[in-house]
């Protein structure tokens, strides 16, 4: 499946011992259990000192494991902060739920 290919691609990238890892939706196509595995793995990679830049649709999950997060609105940087700050920011929640326009920043 596409999700399994994601996990294999991540493993192959890690074999190169990178200092920075770029991930494009690492949980895409995975079952909920495998999504948990993917996020645990990303968290472990980050804790091991590998800078991880991730694009992810599952904002809540992503912000739970990241040190810093950036929320884009119409391709522009709208908000930046710790995961906790962003998860508690009403404007970010509004953007995520689609209840705020592009002038939310």
Residue ranges and their predicted role:
Residues 10:
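Hydrophobic anchor residue at the start of the ABC signature
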Residues 15-19:
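A short, proline-enriched helix->beta-strand linker immediately N-terminal to the Walker B motif
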Residues 21-25:
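Catalytic Walker B motif of ABC-type/P-loop ATPase nucleotide-binding domains
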Residues 35-48:
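Helical segment within the ABC ATPase nucleotide-binding domain
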Residues 62-64:
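A short, surface-exposed alpha-helical micro-motif characterized by mixed small hydrophobic
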Residues 68, 80:
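Short, glycine/charged-rich "phosphate-handling" switch motifs in NTP-dependent
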Residues 71-72, 88-105:
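C-terminal boundary and immediately downstream tail of ABC-type ATPase nucleotide-binding domains
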């Amino acid at each position: 499946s596409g999700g399994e290919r994601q996990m294999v691609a991540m493993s192959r990238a890690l074999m190169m011992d990178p200092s920075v890892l770029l991930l494009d939706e690492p949980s895409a196509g995975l079952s909920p259990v495998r999504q948990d595995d993917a996020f645990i793995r990303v968290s472990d990679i980050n804790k091991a000192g590998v800078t991880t830049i991730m694009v992810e649709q599952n904002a809540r999950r992503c912000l739970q494991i990241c040190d810093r997060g950036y929320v884009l609105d119409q391709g522009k940087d709208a908000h930046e902060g710790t995961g906790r700050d962003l998860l508690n920011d009403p404007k970010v929640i509004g953007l995520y739920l689609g209840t705020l326009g592009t002038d939310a920043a």
